[in-house]
Amino acid sequence: VAEGVIGGSPTSGPLPGSPGLDKPIYTISVAAEILETHPRTLMMYENIGLVVPQRTSTNRRRFSQRDIYKLQTIQSLTRQHGVNLTGVRYVLALLKALNDHGIPPPDALKDIDVSALKI
């Protein structure tokens, strides 16, 4: 997962004076650079419904900080935990359900904070 993400962390929230978590500020090329991945990968995630960036009036994608956090989580699940993309959708939904019911996640997934993600 890329380091040095601008705007705080999911648990600490945005830094003072920075845009909110849901403000669409990153173009696809900037988001890809932050995540150290190819823009086409982000387009694939969008096509299968894992992330839904907002669109400008000219139909250009804009990713929010919350989208970046979600994409980092997807990267963590696929790279560190070996989960395929179908499994990612299932794991995220399961983690959200556990979080909604106040149940802690399994030890292997404690590093994933779903509270800041829109799932």
Predicted features along the sequence, with ranges:
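Short coil turns linking two alpha-helices in DNA-binding domains
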Residues: H38-R40
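Arg/Lys-rich, alpha-helical DNA-contact motif
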Residues: V1-E33, M43, N47, V52-P53, ...
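Conserved catalytic core of two-component sensor histidine kinases, primarily the HATPase_c ATP-binding
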Residues: R60
